Amino acid sequence: MPHSTPSTRSDIAVIGAGIVGVCVALKLQEQGRQVLLIDRDHPGAATSFGNAGLIERSSVFPYAFPRDWSTLIAYALQKKTAAHYHWKALASLMPWLVGYWRHSSPHLYPAAIAGALPLIENSWTEHAPLIEAAGVSRLVNQNGWIKVWRHQDTEQASLDQAKQSLAYGLSVKVLSNSELQIKEPGLDPALIGGVHYPDSRQIHDPQALTTAYLNLFLQRGGRFIRGDAQSLQRDGQRWQVTTDEGPHSADAAVVALGPWGEDLAQKLGYQLKMGRKRGYHMHFAARGTAPTHVIVDVDNGYALAPMQQGIRLTTGAEFALRDAPPTPVQLDRIEPIARTLYSLGARLDQQAWMGSRPCTIDMLPVLGPAPKHPGLWFCFGHAHHGLTQAAASARLLAEMICGRETFADPKPYRVDRF
């Protein structure tokens, strides 16, 4: 881990060194600000570590809460592998779930699409120069991802969404069974078809990307110190946080704590109505040829992603308390299904990895100034798209902090919208 020269003062302290926080630090640095990055752990070691690695330019439709009763009943009875829930967590999750369901309605869902669009459209264009400057172009898979299915009803819904994607300028290629076999020879020949989304990129090692961004930040004069995010407090006209090198104060502070952001926000008096979708992954050896695209099994709600560590199987959503003990039920249910989809070898990890996706009721991040606290800014709540939206969110926040003209309207992400 690179270290930096200790200091007790800076222009801005960024609290949280996941992919979002590191991007915020870099974008503020590009605006000429002196930035200190603070985290209790190794950068990128928590939520940012375990995703499928997609920088998802084609994901213009946020993950909505199901509306049809048959799907809802199947989820309630734990019949679908795409989701799992803890009974004991439902009472505390209910306000968020109800809000999430309401914002997924035909009346409100278009606002979620419109709000997310600037961050999605600029996802790759904001990441690309950072990747080049950090010298890690080797981590980028340019092949995009493929959605596959086995059932006719799933096929129609997937084709309808692919057609709708064309209105947003996306490249979409519908694949027959034989075309699927050409693109990915290791796939189950019984699949009906698929859709290829080539505009997205995939990172073969998301934590390596975060570490490379951190190194770039340090090379450009930034500083990283381990510290306690929950110690952040107002100190006169400045913000102070306790670090391993003593108290540090800054003119402004950015909270970029992912699923822990709401804890600090609540401590400061903000009610953000957030929930968490936990997810799991496991790496597998390749038996023969490894996939060259991320493959999403839309029928069963999981993805297979080619990684430096092996083939990463990522699960859908688990609705549970963030800090409850891991229950990798979905992973155990999905593995036999995934083995019929693609030829997987042995498990490579001793235990399943688990992370939490921070989710708002309206499927948009919390991004902007904390209205009751001058000099305090929030940037978290990116749900399934933390990696995707990190660099664009960071640019927007840096423009706001530095008083620049913003590339997008920040109103949909404001802190006081709930």
List PLM regions with ranges.
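A conserved short coil-to-beta-strand element within the FAD-binding core of flavoproteins
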Residues: 175-183, 225-239
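C-terminal catalytic lobe of FAD-dependent flavoproteins
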Residues: 172, 299, 340-418
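Beta1/beta-strand and adjacent pyrophosphate-binding region of the FAD-binding site
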Residues: 6-18
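Glycine-rich FAD pyrophosphate-binding loop
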Residues: 30-49
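Active-site substrate-recognition segment that forms the wall
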Residues: 51-54, 59, 63-103, 231-234, ...
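N-terminal Rossmann-fold NAD(P) dinucleotide-binding loop
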Residues: 21-22
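Rossmann-like flavin
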Residues: 94-215
